[in-house]
């Protein structure tokens, strides 16, 4: 996380296997191995659809600023309009000037808007642009489930949780969608 790795540019924690090295496309250099992301769930109050839309606009802005502040080279706008590329260049320059910590801290502030104990919903509030609300009651005390050769703690109502994130999670996606979506390569360290 950001407390244990000075150059770590994200607000989520990761379990890293440092026998490997991750080399990222267009992200400032930091030491990372093969990893599993840990997405914390924070209180989300009793949010309405309009509150979710408003929050998602803030998150979208902050995510763009975070990603532009940590990229290692400029890429013109994909909209093929010179003025959009010019605007992106200046906004990216502002993001670089402010630095990733500034925007990561702003994103971190979003999680403190709602008291966890009095919230009906929980959501991952410190990363990504889309707020996915989950009923806090789905988690309860949790349950232990088998995952390969270990037991892990899972939500009490894991079915509702998985459906809200993945829809029909027991059905494989079409073959053409079964591809990696992150921009990095992994290498075994010597």
Task: Name every feature range the model reports, one short phrase each.
Residues 2-46, 56, 66-78, 83-167, ...:
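Conserved catalytic core of two-metal-ion nucleotidyltransferases
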Residues 52-63:
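Short, surface-exposed, charged loop/turn segments at secondary-structure junctions
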């Amino acid at each position: 996380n950001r407390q244990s790795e000075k150059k770590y540019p994200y607000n989520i924690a990761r379990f890293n296997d440092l026998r490997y090295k991750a080399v990222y496309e267009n992200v400032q250099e930091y030491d990372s191995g093969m990893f599993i992301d840990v997405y914390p769930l924070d209180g989300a109050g009793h949010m309405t659809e309009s509150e979710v839309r408003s929050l998602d606009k803030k998150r979208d802005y902050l995510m763009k600023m975070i990603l532009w502040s940590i990229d290692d080279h400029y890429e013109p706008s994909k909209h093929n309009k010179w003025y959009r590329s010019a605007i992106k260049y200046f906004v990216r320059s502002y993001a670089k000037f402010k630095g990733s910590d500034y925007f990561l801290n702003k994103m971190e502030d979003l999680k403190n808007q709602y008291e966890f104990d009095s919230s009906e919903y929980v959501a991952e509030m410190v990363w990504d642009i889309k707020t996915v609300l989950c009923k806090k009651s789905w988690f309860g005390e949790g349950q232990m489930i088998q995952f390969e050769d270990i037991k892990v703690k899972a939500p009490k109502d894991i079915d509702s949780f998985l459906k809200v994130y993945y829809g029909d999670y027991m059905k494989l996606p079409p073959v053409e969608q079964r591809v990696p979506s992150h921009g990095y390569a992994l290498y075994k360290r010597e």
